[in-house]
Amino acid sequence: MPTLMVQGTTSDAGKTTVVAALCRWLARQGVSVAPFKPQNMALNSAVTVDGGEIGRSTALQALACGLEPHSDMNPVLLKPQSDCGAQVILRGKVHGNMDALDYHAYKAEAMNSVMASWRDLSARYDVVIAEGAGSPAEINLRANDIANMGFAEAADCPVLLVGDIDKGGVFAQLVGTLALISDSERGRTAGFVINRFRGDIALLEPGLDWLTEHTGKPVFGVLPYLHGLVIDSEDSVSAAGTSEAGALKVVVPVLPRISNHNDFDPLRLHPGVDLVFVGTDEPIPPADLIILPGSKSTRHDLQWLKQQGWPEAIQKHLRYGGKLLGICGGFQMLGLKVEDPEGLEGEVGTTKGLALFEMVTRMVPGKQLRMVNGGLTSHVASTAVTGALKGYEMHNGVTEGAALVRPFAELEGRPDGAVSADGQVAGTYIHGVFDEPAACKAILAWAGLKTQGEQSVDYQRHRLQQLDRLADQVDQCLDTDRLRSLLQL
């Protein structure tokens, strides 16, 4: 079955967005299509229908296709644990920890997983839209490449090269990338897509004509800068720019190994929430609600919290009646200690927690990966909210202790998380707690948002609307006849 690969001249050129747009455009025409990312490096991941995990951006592209995410869609996922090492996920399951040099040597073997997943997807769907990583012209990474042209050559598929004009220098990026790849790779580069253009397209046309004449490659189209586009971000942490007067102030520390910060996307969109992310050495502002996010290295990030003065700020926050919520790794930090006897998240050892819950977390092999459904308990909501939670668990830790007798949620017959006796502190292992409107409304009411009215955001509906907006741009701005020909449709 046809495969088309989208590569970029740089990181953040718009590959993820273009792939999502193409997937949605094809799916709306009734084409059976699936996304594919051979290798991804990200701490934001999603649980798959087959009990694995893949990068969050690929899960978004699956949604664009109308599919549940599957491990075959992202066969190699690298989750950084330090500047020089990462946890390697192969076809959804933890393979082990590797430093950069070891992984570079391992890539030839990882390619077997990549090709096996691609073949399985190709057998199940009519079209596969693949996404590269970074740039195909990184000279130091070209040996044993599995993320860009290495995969395209093995799969014998055409490539679209995306450049971001908003950053400037797009013609140099496109021409320079072609100059640095091999003759064979240039031959399979079908053409260009220019992304994030602002202004009158007539002013750009002389440059487009020159680009085609100079390279012999067509420009498939120019996508505009889409103001107000909000879709899942995999790498960057950013807050919304506007909120209503009297909004609930929510503060989140940007942990060095923060993971799954997409948990906060519904709060970014909520008009009644003023969401603030606080980074290293930044002042900690007053808040109504502090949320400790997920972490790929709980003990490391717990030490960072202490160095940055968060325990003292949290104690002051609670004395003045503020609320505190911990999610996954953030929940683990609220206990007496976090033990890692096998060094699953870094060095072997034990780190004292914030001691706000009578509980202990122990890191054990065998990551918990599962989608969950359930409801909030009356400990955190004014009354129990049944059927309001849909999310996922993704953690190594096993947590035990007296604090768990007051659970945060009930998940199909089993408890999750904890709530303090005074109701000020809560914790949960569930990612996606704000995704469903009823749960989001109840948690924000617990945190102090008095009047919500019709403010709650239907996050899933919003995501689909944004994907449809992207697909509309394919119809309006790209050469769809040329695309169909490339895809043999």
UniProtKB/Swiss-Prot annotation:
Residues 247-439 form the GATase cobBQ-type domain. Coiled coil: none annotated. The active site is at C328 (nucleophile), H431. Signal peptide: none annotated. GO terms for molecular function: ABC-type vitamin B12 transporter activity; catalytic activity. GO terms for biological process: cobalamin biosynthetic process. Keywords: Cobalamin biosynthesis, Glutamine amidotransferase. It holds the Pfam family CbiA. It comes from the Bacteria. The keyword Lyase does not apply. The keyword Ubl conjugation does not apply. Pathway: Cofactor biosynthesis; adenosylcobalamin biosynthesis. InterPro entries: Class_I_gatase-like, CobQ/CobB/MinD/ParA_Nub-bd_dom, CobQ_GATase1, CobQ_N, CobQ_synth, GATase_3, P-loop_NTPase. Catalyzes amidations at positions B, D, E, and G on adenosylcobyrinic A,C-diamide. NH(2) groups are provided by glutamine, and one molecule of ATP is hydrogenolyzed for each amidation. HAMAP family: CobQ. Belongs to the CobB/CobQ family. CobQ subfamily. This is Cobyric acid synthase. It comes from Marinobacter nauticus (strain ATCC 700491 / DSM 11845 / VT8). The gene is cobQ.
